[in-house]
């Protein structure tokens, strides 16, 4: 995890983010300091890709909720902290109201983290607690290494799901379900012949 020493506000960070290495794609703002995470491997992208397809199907059926990808969520001010979970699912406000933003202070109903690198794994417990304290109802942690998903609903015991188990979003996304193994399935075009 690399960092720079200049303290920024969330808005300054959003303005400068695309000037950072990799367009700031793997950068977060922690107490005003830019922190660059390790670029994830293909298994991270594959899990997000597969979840994106499932959420796309859900969005076509669901009249209110929608997903945002790599949207910065402002979790603290003075000094500012902006975290970028892989996926955020919103049920409140205008449909797709957060979609075109780089950062927002609106908290989603569901946050999806992907534990694909050591630096992403290191602070997961603290991040989950923070999400719940800020009103996020459900946190999923996708672990591409063990091919498991940890589903942590606020105020409830964490649930660990493996291939063959069904991932559900309960009241957060009514009717959503996905067999866990589908998250880790390689696309047919990816497979070597």
Positions of predicted regions on the chain:
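Gly/Pro/Ser/Thr-rich low-complexity, intrinsically disordered segments predominantly at protein N-termini
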Residues: 1-193
């Amino acid at each position: 995890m690399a960092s720079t020493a200049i303290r920024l506000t969330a808005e300054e960070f959003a303005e400068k983010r695309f000037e950072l290495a990799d367009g700031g794609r793997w950068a977060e703002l922690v107490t005003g300091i830019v922190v660059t995470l390790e670029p994830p491997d293909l298994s991270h992208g594959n899990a997000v890709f597969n979840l994106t397809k499932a959420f796309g199907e859900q969005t076509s059926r669901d009249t209110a909720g929608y997903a945002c990808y790599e949207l910065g969520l402002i979790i603290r001010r003075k000094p500012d902290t902006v975290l970028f979970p892989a996926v955020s699912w919103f049920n409140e406000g205008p449909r797709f109201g957060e979609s075109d933003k780089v950062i927002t202070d609106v908290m989603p109903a569901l946050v999806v983290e992907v534990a694909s690198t050591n630096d992403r794994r290191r602070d997961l417990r603290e991040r989950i607690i923070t999400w719940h304290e800020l009103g996020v109802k459900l946190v999923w942690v996708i672990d591409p290494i063990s091919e498991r998903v940890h589903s942590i609903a606020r105020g409830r015991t964490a649930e660990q799901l493996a291939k063959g188990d069904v991932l559900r979003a309960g009241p957060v996304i009514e009717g959503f379900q996905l067999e866990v193994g589908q998250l880790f399935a390689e696309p047919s075009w990816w497979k070597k012949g």
